[in-house]
From Swiss-Prot:
This is QWRF motif-containing protein 7. A motif (QWRF motif) lies at residues 211-214. Residues 97-110 have a biased composition (Basic and acidic residues). It comes from the Eukaryota. Residues 1-171 are annotated as: Disordered. InterPro entries: QWRF. Pfam families: QWRF.
Length: 394
């Protein structure tokens, strides 16, 4: 065939970028031809499938294609039919997706390589999930391109050419298996391009929200650490200020005490010589004080002689002598009565002790009087028992 000699681009590595940006993978031309021949044979055998046209279209991608439309696809022989109206276009897109999935399934079955298995598992026929590369700020301008374009975009072939053995296997496949696989992929849920664009925008917004949440959480953590550090610094500053205040107060108290000591020393420095001489002046001072007391006593006892008053010294002398004799007699009587008074006081103390003992005895007697009725009752009961015993013995 002429198309087998075309140089194909090697497949891209199996990463998130290749899976999320291109929602579907184009088939090689040889596989297209084999698929068209198989479908034509099935359409000739069954009249119900004669109206279906075999074509492999590509789902709309969120990015611009690196290859222009119609440049190399016209040479490869792929049939891209523009849409007449919206209903026929959506039907053709769905048919193309299902057949492309079936072709990918056949390719995986014939090849069995782990890379194709991984790519077929990562790519879904109806939807595409945006990757971190697609959600990057540099790709936002390309993501804003409308998904509902008039014609589907084409991409370069991502699979190597098939061997003649695999082509023969595909051509010799039964029509029943093809119909079952097509029905299985047709029964799956389809996603419209508008919903795909909404999902893509939603993922972008969700990624931005997560980024802002991470930024806010990191700022909150830094602010919390900064707050803790500032609080610690404020606490240590407050502690230092408190210690400085205590130190200043202690210094002020010490200064005030030193000032008072200085004042006391100044006062005592003037009085210390006089205090040292006090031992010599003490006897003279006591004698002068005794003379002063006697003079004051004499002045208080003497009567003033005013208004021509006179005193009979003889009569006063006689009266003073009589008073002194009476005082002496009173003193003698008191001396005589002192032993008697002592005896009387001793007897009074003994009487007080006896009176206290009598009070105790009276209290004991009251208690014994209270117990007399009990004893009498016991005595009567004992007598009754004795009488009963004597009667029983008889």
């Amino acid at each position: 065939m002429a198309t087998t000699g075309r140089r194909l681009r090697p497949p891209s590595p199996n990463n998130n970028r290749s899976r999320t940006i291109s929602s579907s993978i184009s088939l090689p031309v040889s596989l297209n031809a084999s698929l068209s021949s198989s479908t034509s044979s099935s359409s000739s055998s069954s009249p119900s499938n004669s109206s279906k046209r075999v074509m492999i279209t590509r789902s709309q991608s969120t990015t611009r294609s690196s290859r222009p439309i119609g440049s190399s696809d016209s040479k490869s022989g792929e049939n891209i039919i523009p849409a007449r109206n919206s209903a026929s276009r959506s039907q053709e897109i769905n048919n193309g997706r299902s057949r492309e999935s079936f072709a990918r399934y056949l390719e995986q079955r014939t090849r069995g390589s782990p890379r194709s298995n991984a790519s077929s598992r990562g790519v879904k026929p109806g939807a595409s999930s945006p990757s971190a590369w697609a959600l990057s700020p540099g790709r936002l301008s390309t993501m804003k391109t409308p998904l509902s374009s008039s014609a589907p975009t084409t991409s370069m072939c991502m699979t190597p050419p098939e061997s003649p053995v695999s082509k023969a296997k595909i051509r010799s496949g039964g029509g029943g298996a093809v119909a079952g696989v097509l029905k299985y992929f047709m029964a799956q849920k389809k996603v419209s391009p508008v919903q795909e664009e909404d999902y893509h925008r939603f993922r972008i917004f969700q990624n931005r929200l997560l980024q802002w949440r991470f930024v806010n959480a990191r700022t909150e953590a830094t602010m919390a650490n900064l707050k803790i550090n500032v609080e610690d610094q404020l606490f240590w500053v407050w502690l230092r200020i408190y210690k400085m205040r205590n130190y200043v107060v202690e210094n002020l108290i010490e200064i005030q005490r030193l000032r008072q000591d200085i004042k006391v020393r100044e006062v005592l420095s003037l009085q210390m010589p006089l205090l040292n001489e006090w031992s010599k002046i003490d006897a003279k001072n006591s004698e002068a004080l005794s003379k002063l007391t006697r003079k004051l006593h004499a002045l208080s006892v003497r009567l003033p002689l005013v208004h021509g008053a006179t005193i009979d010294m003889v009569s006063i002398h006689e009266e003073m002598v009589i008073a002194i004799e009476v005082m002496d007699e009173i003193e003698d009587v008191i001396i005589k009565f002192l032993p008697r008074v002592e005896i009387i006081l001793y007897e009074l103390t003994e009487l007080i002790g006896m009176f206290n003992q009598e009070l105790l005895y009276f209290e004991e007697m009251d208690e014994s009087l209270l117990s007399i009725p009990l004893f009498t009752a016991k005595e009567s009961s004992l007598r009754v028992h004795i009488l009963q015993k004597t009667e029983e013995q008889r």
